[in-house]
């Protein structure tokens, strides 16, 4: 039994200012108070029931040892020399050993003993760590300088051994010694638990507002512009691939274009650039195969006018972009100012599964690609290109696909999580989204021309409802947007675009209806001036043009303004009005109220 006492003089490893020291005259005075209340059989049974057999044995040994009077304790010969050796090697801790070993540990153990039935299993294991060290000397690493000891059969001797200081530090660092202010009270047995971190915080952490992550942006890619698609980004993306977004067929999504905050020096001829938003297949695919897929899709549409990509007639488009043009069935272009952020709403009318005649085939991923050109040079100078993958579903399929990916992600993370956190997962799952927007990835390939689809139909239908805007600078520039016609078979060659007449380029289409009507009438202004408006009203309502003498415009704020040529020239196509025709002294007064 002498080995159990060998470690008592070296329990205090260093003079740590964080440990509260207690002073006591000697060990017997400290233990005399505890011997007045010896351990009862009920206390021992309770401790054993909680699995603390080591604690019962250790406390029993200490009680038996201090019951013997000090003068009757036997200390073996040779122990004193070794104790002196330890004291000389640890002289800096000499004044603290007695106070720490006798008072601090014994008071700490006694507190644990008196409230054992109130502690949890984890607390008990921490409380008796020091006793475990006493009863299991093999846990300490002995140096080659350890001296032999002569044990005693009846009593524990105060012999000491030399141990590595680092081993002692490692062993006793976890021992928790509460300060007087932190000592637990009988009416408050358990400490207040610290809040546990959310088990899925690595999943739910929102991504930073920046461009695509650095791991898949090529270092030499142009980062002068940033394009975002306001649709949640897919969770599972293969390494090195462009980000992917899930979209619904026929639903309009905003696309934002802006200049990067830290913009490189781009030598533009003006502040305006021309961007082409297109839906294309991977540029690495054979262009003939791409055109075959577009033709297959177009042949299955209910009308020949069905386009792949549409632009919404939202006011946000008119405020930030201009000269919106449908250059192909799968592409549209517009002009915007690099000093302002541009926003345009696009909708897609195809599904990822529309390009195969077989049912049950996995959908083909498409690319949403944005090419930006210097406006003054037409499409001769490509300055930026970015892409992202898109998969198009029907009937809210994009939302279902996102929910499926979320469940898989939580299931994968939940395998290592505690079952007690089901409430946390259930509360977070419904509203979770990987990312609210999808950033388009800049690419370095600025040479490959995208394949644009223009079917063999009347090309005046390319401009919807009379929307005739400025075309590309010339025919050679238009052809540079797609692969040269020499690379296509004769049957797949796209014919040149129809040239617009100067008369068509000035037409403006307005929608008007009366207060009592529910359906709008279309007014086609052959010339964007007051004369053209009077002529259109006269033809539509069969009124003599000479009887129309006043034309007013009533703003939403109620302001009545005389209509003139400047106001009409600034009208965009498809603007809607309420038409009021009033007879005044045999003449007609026209009032257009904004909606």
From Swiss-Prot:
The keyword Nucleus applies. Its main location: nucleus. GO terms for biological process: regulation of transcription by RNA polymerase II. Residues 484-505 are annotated as: Disordered. Residues 29-92 are annotated as: Transcription activation. Residues 221-454 form the Grh/CP2 DB domain. Keywords: DNA-binding, Nucleus, Transcription, Transcription regulation. GO terms for molecular function: DNA-binding transcription activator activity, RNA polymerase II-specific; RNA polymerase II cis-regulatory region sequence-specific DNA binding. It is found in: Nucleus. GO terms for cellular component: nucleus. Pfam families: CP2 (PF04516), GRHL1_C (PF25416). Transcription factor playing important roles in primary neurulation and in the differentiation of stratified epithelia of both ectodermal and endodermal origin. Binds directly to the consensus DNA sequence 5'-AACCGGTT-3' acting as an activator and repressor on distinct target genes. GRHL genes (GRHL1, GRHL2 and GRHL3) show a paradoxal lack of redundancy despite their extensive sequence identity in the DNA-binding and protein dimerization domains and the fact that the core consensus DNA binding sites are identical. They have related but remarkably different functions during embryogenesis because of their differential spatiotemporal expression patterns during development. Belongs to the grh/CP2 family. Grainyhead subfamily. This is Grainyhead-like protein 3 homolog. The lineage of its organism: Eukaryota, Metazoa, Chordata, Craniata, Vertebrata. The gene is grhl3.
């Amino acid at each position: 039994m002498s080995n159990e006492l060998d470690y008592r003089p070296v329990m205090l490893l260093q003079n740590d200012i964080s440990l509260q020291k207690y002073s006591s005259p000697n060990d017997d005075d400290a233990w005399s108070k505890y011997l007045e209340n010896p351990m009862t059989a009920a206390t021992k049974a309770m401790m054993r029931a909680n699995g603390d057999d080591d604690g019962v044995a250790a406390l029993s040994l200490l009680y038996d040892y201090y019951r013997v009077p000090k003068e009757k304790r036997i200390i073996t010969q040779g122990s004193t020399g070794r104790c002196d050796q330890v004291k000389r090697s640890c002289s800096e801790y000499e004044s603290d050993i007695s106070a720490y070993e006798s008072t601090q540990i014994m008071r700490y153990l006694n507190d644990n003993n008196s409230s054992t039935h109130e502690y949890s299993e984890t607390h008990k294991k921490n409380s008796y760590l020091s006793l475990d060290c006493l009863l299991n000397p093999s846990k300490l690493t002995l140096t080659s300088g350890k001296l032999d000891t002569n044990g005693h059969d009846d009593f524990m001797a105060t012999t000491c051994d030399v141990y590595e200081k680092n081993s002692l530090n490692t062993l006793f660092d976890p021992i928790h010694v509460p300060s007087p202010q932190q000592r637990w009270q009988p009416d408050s047995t358990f400490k207040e638990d610290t809040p546990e971190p959310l088990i899925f915080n690595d999943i739910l952490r929102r991504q930073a507002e920046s461009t695509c992550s650095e791991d898949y942006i090529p270092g030499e890619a142009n980062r002068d512009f940033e394009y975002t698609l306001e649709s949640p980004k897919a969770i599972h993306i293969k390494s090195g691939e462009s980000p992917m977004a899930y979209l619904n067929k026929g639903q309009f999504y905003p696309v934002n274009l802006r200049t990067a905050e830290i913009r490189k020096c781009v030598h533009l001829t003006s502040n305006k650039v021309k961007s082409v938003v297109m839906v294309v297949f991977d540029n690495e695919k054979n262009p003939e195969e791409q055109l075959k897929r577009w033709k297959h899709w177009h042949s299955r549409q209910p009308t020949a006018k069905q386009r792949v990509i549409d632009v919404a007639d939202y006011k946000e488009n008119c405020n930030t972009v201009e000269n919106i043009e449908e250059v192909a069935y799968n592409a549209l272009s517009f002009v915007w100012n690099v000093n302002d952020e541009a926003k345009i709403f696009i909708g897609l009318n195809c599904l990822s599964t529309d390009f195969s005649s077989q049912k049950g085939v996995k959908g083909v991923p498409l690319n949403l690609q944005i090419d930006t050109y210097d406006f003054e040079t037409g499409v001769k100078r490509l300055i930026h290109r970015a892409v992202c993958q898109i998969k198009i579903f029907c009937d809210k399929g994009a939302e279902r696909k996102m929910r499926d990916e979320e469940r898989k992600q939580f299931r994968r993370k939940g395998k290592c999580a505690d079952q007690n956190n089901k409430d946390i997962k259930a509360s977070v799952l419904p509203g979770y989204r990987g990312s609210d927007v999808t950033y388009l990835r800049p690419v370095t390939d600025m040479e490959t021309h995208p394949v644009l689809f223009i079917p063999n139909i009347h090309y005046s239908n390319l401009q919807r409802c009379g929307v005739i805007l400025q075309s590309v600078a010339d025919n050679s520039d238009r052809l540079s947007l797609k692969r040269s016609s020499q690379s296509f078979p004769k049957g797949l060659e796209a014919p040149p675009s129809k040239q617009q007449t100067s008369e068509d380029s000035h037409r403006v289409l307005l929608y008007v209806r009366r207060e009592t009507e529910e359906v709008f009438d279309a007014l086609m202004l052959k010339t964007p001036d007051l004369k053209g408006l009077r002529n259109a009203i006269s033809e539509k309502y069969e009124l003599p043009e000479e009887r129309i003498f006043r034309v007013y415009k009533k703003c939403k704020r109620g302001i009545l303004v005389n209509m003139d040529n400047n106001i009409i020239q600034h009208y965009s196509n498809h603007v809607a009005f309420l038409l009021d025709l009033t007879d005044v002294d045999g003449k007609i007064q026209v009032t257009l109220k904004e909606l």
